Amino acid sequence: VKKVFVKTGNFEKFQAAIRAVEARGAPEAGWLLVAGDPARGKSTIVDKWAAQTGAIYLRGKEQWTPSFFLAELAGQLKIDDSLRGKARFQAVITRIGAEQMPVVVDEVQHAMRDNAAVLEVLRDITDLTETIAVLVAGVDDVMRRLARPSLKQIASRIAQVVEFQPNDLGDTALVCQQLADVEIAPDLVAEVHRQSRGLMRPICNAIAGIEAHANRNKLPKVKLADLAGQELCHDWQSRRPQLVKVAAGGR
């Protein structure tokens, strides 16, 4: 499977939301919340954007406290680790403000403990520097938790919400076209889409299996009939493989 970044519909929605946040009227309302079930490409897309823009990328951790968060942020910025308390905070503010560096917090549910104390620190940082923050929700109840009255000051900083959806058939075809080292016929693309339900991880796993079959059989192009009766995607919930079925006369 090729290491290529595919610009799917979710990527385009994310880019549009970033542009809207950049054009915001209220400087303090500079947060973007990215939501959606796992395997929809949230982290991959946001990580790509962070790398392109020079954003600070942090992955939330179960043990996060405000001081732990600030220490990790300072570490990413290569700030003198002997600084503590107000001195460390001021150094972070100075660096982020001077370079207008966005901050990404992936798995933001881990920043919700103790009435979102970590996000209160992030709010102070973005308010003082007027920079953008991107929050990536790894679970589906983050939006509900952010809607609590006690968190209205934090929620008011969110200017845009992007909810990632499963890839449609067109996006699945685009992923197959750009990531596969072998040509995948439209009928097999449709089967990949059906079995994967448009989720990125199963799509990539299916592509890897198709490539392996093509290499074993020296096929420049793989059709649905070529994989009849073989496993394409594994359904872990039912604990059994999903086999490719070909209609009678389809071979």
Segments the model singles out, each with a brief description of its role:
Residues 16, 20-25:
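A structured, charge-rich N-terminal accessory region that forms the first stable segment of a protein
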